[in-house]
Amino acid sequence: MANQRKFFVGGNWKMNGDRAGIDSIISFMKGPLSADTEVVVGCPQCYLMYTREHLPSNIGVAAQNCYKVAKGAFTGEISPSMIKDCGCEWVILGHSERRNVFNEPDTLISEKVGHALEAGLKVIPCIGEKLEERESNRTEEVVFAQMKALVPNISDWSRVVIAYEPVWAIGTGKTATPEQAQEVHAKLRQWLRDNVNAEVADSTRIIYGGSVTPGNCKELAKTGDIDGFLVGGASLKPDFVQIINARD
């Protein structure tokens, strides 16, 4: 089934960039990019409109976070409807930095995912274990618990791309080997089969995040259950194009 799931590469700019930097990214994002890869970039919220207006229409634009309700007294937050009003159709939710720096629990992330889907956005929910959890053989326990929290609020799986990002491999230069990453992706797909249904398991894209580079992307892309990448720092550099074209 892997070849029936369109390859997906997301770029997460995090809290980086200004208009001049975005202009340079837009310049190298003109490609050539593989037509067989869906590409989405997640920019800081103040640049959502600027990025959407200047990027080619075949590249999606995502917010990096949103809140769980449409409007109200929630200073500093943005809603899915605001993201849509900026012309964007994606949001990244539950990134490890939201979980670990801002202490967002599974329940809140799940509520955010649910509201974003109800509002018509497409969602990239992120899951993943810390180094101490992997070293104590708790990877499955942790990622399955994160998935279990998400599932009740997912109303439309066709608008969901799951990002598995082992926290110990984010920005550290450490990368899960293709075998390590494939093993977790296969177990996540089996979990979907057992806890949702076979159709969702076969059709849902599960992408990998964690120090993806031009040097390791092709080997990761060859595995059967890795359907793409969520890329951090490398998405700010021209090398990002090589990652987008990893299956070429």
Curated annotation (Swiss-Prot):
GO cellular component entries: cytoplasm; cytosol
Domain of life: Eukaryota
GO MF, any single term: methylglyoxal synthase activity
Pathway: Carbohydrate biosynthesis; gluconeogenesis; Carbohydrate degradation; glycolysis; D-glyceraldehyde 3-phosphate from glycerone phosphate: step 1/1
pH dependence: Unstable only at extreme acidic (pH 1.0) or alkaline conditions (pH 11.0). IgE-binding activity is relatively stable under acidic and alkaline conditions, however the activity is increased between pH 2.0-3.0.
Entry EC number(s): 5.3.1.1, 4.2.3.3
Active site: 95, 165
Temperature dependence: Stable up to 100 degrees Celsius. IgE-binding activity is reduced with increasing temperature higher than 60 degrees Celsius.
GO BP term, example: glyceraldehyde-3-phosphate biosynthetic process
One Pfam match: TIM
Record-listed substrate binding positions: 12, 14
Subcellular localization: Cytoplasm
Catalytic activity: D-glyceraldehyde 3-phosphate = dihydroxyacetone phosphate; dihydroxyacetone phosphate = methylglyoxal + phosphate
Region (IgE-binding): 16-30, 166-180, 205-219
Assembly: Homodimer.
Main function: Triosephosphate isomerase is an extremely efficient metabolic enzyme that catalyzes the interconversion between dihydroxyacetone phosphate (DHAP) and D-glyceraldehyde-3-phosphate (G3P) in glycolysis and gluconeogenesis.
Protein name: Triosephosphate isomerase
